[in-house]
Amino acid sequence: MVSVELLRVDPLTAARRLLGAVLTCRGVSATVVEVEAYGGPPDGPWPDAAAHSYRGPGPRNQVMFGPAGRLYTYRSHGIHVCANVACADDGVAAAVLLRAAVIESGHDVVQRRRGEAVRESAFARGPGNLCSALGITMADNGIDVFAEDSPVHLRLGEEQPCIAGPRVGVSKAADRPWRLWLAGRPEVSAYRRSPRAPAPGGSD
């Protein structure tokens, strides 16, 4: 089974399969250690009010509707570029946000991109920092991460035991345990609940 076929599944399964994947981009290689799964609109198989695709397809979120293996990029708060990998069957909205990674090679490149004062464990901690470290930009939206000549290339590895918990900073579906991470990794970001989210237990 080729890598992209392993992502033609529900978003949570895809998220598990993306943990431990090796991401290579513009002189840097990194191993993914934290991800978040996102579903789609109310009439889809995985309704998710926190997903950009919840209100249906549009020019900005079209990549979330497939095909699997395409990179969906967006700006968080209009500033930081964040990257997701589309999953599920073509036409069905689902994606996995790449939240954190450990840099395996290209440390000097990352240091220049992130700044001399940034510690190695924080190079790619958080989705905006991950994209900054690897040089992922908005121009990468829609590219095939499994194509050999892709500027952002992904190679899946063996599934690894992981921990699950609520997603960071979402105000809807705030209790859903769709954030996954590898235990013991200092690169994993801290959990912060959105101040707009209901109290714990008051959301799905």
UniProtKB/Swiss-Prot annotation:
Key words of the record = DNA damage, DNA repair, Hydrolase
Molecular functions per Gene Ontology: alkylbase DNA N-glycosylase activity; DNA binding
Task: Decide whether keyword DNA damage is in the record.
Answer: yes
Name the family: Belongs to the DNA glycosylase MPG family.
Statement: the UniProt record of this protein carries the keyword Transferase:
no
Taxonomy, superkingdom: Bacteria
- Any idea what this protein is called? Putative 3-methyladenine DNA glycosylase
GO BP: any one term: base-excision repair
Q: Which EC class, in a word?
A: hydrolase
Query: What is this enzyme's EC?
Result: 3.2.2.-
